[in-house]
Structures are given as C-alpha cells and as structure tokens.
C-alpha cells in the first residue's frame, strides 16, 4: 500500500486507513489477509524495507511504502478471542 508523500503530510495515516479498508473487504469476501509492515523496518540483511519494495516493483521515490497486504484463501478459519480472556483493564473510556 503506497501513498504519494509529496501530496500529503499524513500519507502514513491515509495509507493505513486504505490498508485497513482492504483488509475488511477481503474478510467480507471470505478471503484471508495479512498486513506485512514495511515502513520503518529492515530486511533480514539490514536493508531498508521501503527501498527494497521500491527497487523490486519500480516504485518512484516520492511514494511512501506503508505495508504489503497478502490476500488469499484461508488455510483455516480462526475463532474469535473468547471475551473472558480479554484484558478489559487495558480499555479506557472517556478518561485514561
């Protein structure tokens, strides 16, 4: 998921919202999806992940690379987290 960083100073947020919408749409279509973080990360050999993606895909430098999304058919269906195992003490409403 890319965004033109020359057009917006909030390109990271814009790309994150777009990626989230794609993840939700994939689920709605019965597909599985996984966010692969790129921005601010390095490859196993220490290279900048954003630049690696730019080089592999021919992405112009002005585009920021937020993430990759792997989308496909699910190998298995996971059950939602059991609510009694959730750490509700980490949830704050109206005040911290």
Predicted segments with their positions:
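Acidic, surface-exposed loops and disordered segments
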Residues: 1-96
């Amino acid at each position: 998921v890319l965004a033109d960083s020359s057009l917006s100073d909030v390109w990271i947020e814009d790309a994150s919202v777009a990626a989230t919408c794609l993840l939700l749409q994939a689920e709605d279509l019965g597909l599985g999806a996984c966010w692969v973080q790129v921005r601010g990360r390095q490859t196993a050999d220490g290279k900048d992940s954003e630049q690696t993606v730019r080089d592999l895909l021919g992405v112009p430098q002005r585009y920021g690379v937020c993430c990759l999304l792997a989308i496909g058919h699910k190998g298995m269906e996971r059950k939602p987290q059991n609510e009694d195992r959730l750490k509700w003490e980490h949830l704050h409403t109206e005040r911290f």
